[in-house]
A protein has these predicted regions:
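Alpha-helical interface subdomain recognition
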Residues: 1-83, 89, 101-106, 113, ...
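Short Ser/Thr-interspersed hydrophobic loop/turn segments at strand-loop and sheet-helix junctions
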Residues: 49, 73-77, 172, 188-193, ...
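Short Gly/Pro-enriched turn/cap motifs at secondary-structure boundaries
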Residues: 114, 129-132, 158-161, 175-177, ...
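A short, Trp-centered hydrophobic/proline-enriched beta-strand micro-motif
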Residues: 117-125
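Hydrophobic, small-residue-rich alpha-helical packing segments that form membrane-like cores
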Residues: 130-133, 148-150
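Flexible, small-/acidic-enriched active-site or ligand-binding loops
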Residues: 136, 191-222
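A structural signal for short hydrophobic beta-strand segments in well-ordered beta-sheet cores
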Residues: 139-143
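A short core secondary-structure module
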Residues: 148-197
Length: 387
């Protein structure tokens, strides 16, 4: 396992860092305050290949590997977590699933505009009453008598990019009696009748990534837009989340890195009792703990990405390594963001600096795409072979 970056990986890392620092960082506070969706910078991200890093060039993407995706996510997240959330959904949850389970025609129609940044995608799994509990999913898809389309009714909640999405991967129950084995995946055109965007969520962090509830009212989905076979949806969703968790781990590493770098600079410049506060042992201990956890989180995330590349070549899943990276990196982001606020003291509580935003943004990494509690359960089950 060699983490020496290839020339190609170094180039995309450099491009992502330049984009993040020059285009994203200067507007992050403004869009966090307003809660507006950053259409312009997301379009630019698409032009640079960041909205479809692992998508083949024939479908509008950059045609790179999982490590390249991790590098892009980390750089963008270090500038603004909200931007990286949008990038993550497009790459990990949407494009990855269609590339793995969709037909060539579905890839051309639904992946190409998203990977190129011309369209925005969403992922519809979570529901108001059951969260991501697929066995109790209430959204129903009923095949019409003539077999030409499905009629979909139900609600999805906490849909990232829902207010602005053009396309969605949706999971709905086609055979309720089979519980999780009765879930089917569909590709949804969000601009068709019966797709209703509900209330936007007033979130603690990642505020520029629009989030809302979606309702389906007699939405007609052509049968050719079903992805995979009937009843295959749950396995598709879990496989996609394996990949998505690596992206969230990279996002968490980016947030942690931003918090650490801000703390380093402040510790050097802020003076108290005649000395830089970085010379005080209590501050040094915090910085040392941040550095150790940050490096460990980064390496676990790189390992998960490397393993994903190997697993993909062999047609295997990458469940364990993705969950380990996501769990540790997300808790590292919270640890580093909390320490950064403490190091900055009163200024860490002020919106004049981005440190308080890092703190607010970090929390979601412990929640979405499987909470820390779920990750611990996944890891233990993978290791013991027990359920």
């Amino acid at each position: 396992m060699d983490f020496t970056l290839s020339e190609e990986q170094q180039l995309i890392q450099s491009a992502a860092r330049e984009f993040a620092q020059n285009e994203v960082a200067p507007i992050a506070a403004q869009f966090d305050a307003s809660g507006e969706f950053p259409f312009e910078t997301i379009r630019k991200a698409g032009e640079l290949g960041f909205m479809g890093v692992e998508v083949p060039t024939e479908f509008g993407g950059a045609g790179l590997d999982a490590i390249s995706y991790v590098l892009v996510m980390e750089e963008i997240a270090a500038a603004d977590a909200a931007h990286s959330t949008i990038v993550s959904v497009n790459n990990s949850l949407y494009c990855a699933g269609i590339l793995a389970y969709g037909s060539d025609e579905q890839r051309k129609r639904f992946v190409t505009p998203v990977a190129s940044g011309q369209a925005i995608a969403a992922y519809g799994l979570t529901e108001p009453q059951s969260g991501s509990d697929a066995a109790n999913m209430r959204t129903r898809a009923v095949l019409a008598p003539d077999g030409s389309h499905y009629v979909i009714n139900g609600k999805k909640s906490w849909i990232t990019s829902g207010p602005v999405a053009d396309f969605m991967v949706l999971f709905a129950m086609t055979q309720p009696e089979k519980k999780s084995h009765g879930v089917t995946a569909f590709l949804i055109d969000c601009n068709q009748p019966g797709f209703i965007r509900g209330k936007s969520e007033p979130k603690l962090g990642i505020r520029a990534s629009a989030t809302c509830e979606i309702e389906f009212q007699d939405y007609r989905c052509p049968v050719e837009n079903r992805m995979g076979a009937e009843g295959q949806g749950f396995s598709i969703a879990m496989s996609v989340l394996d990949s998505g968790r690596i992206g969230i781990a990279a996002q968490a590493v980016g947030i942690a890195r931003a918090a650490y770098e801000a703390s380093l600079q402040y510790a050097r410049e802020r003076r108290a009792f005649g000395s830089p506060i970085g010379s005080f042992q209590m501050i040094q201990q915090k910085l040392a703990d941040m550095k150790c956890r940050l490096d460990a989180a980064h390496l676990l995330t790189m390992r998960a990405a490397w393993n994903k590349n190997q697993a993909k070549a062999k047609g295997l899943r990458n469940t364990l390594e993705g969950s380990v990276a996501k769990l540790f990196a997300s808790e590292t982001a919270m640890f580093c963001a909390h320490a950064a606020v403490q190091i900055h003291a009163g200024m860490g509580y002020s919106k004049e600096l981005p440190v308080e935003r890092y703190f607010r943004d970090a929390k979601i990494t412990e929640i979405y795409e499987g909470t820390s509690e779920i990750q611990r359960m996944v890891i233990a089950r993978q290791e013991t072979g027990l359920r």
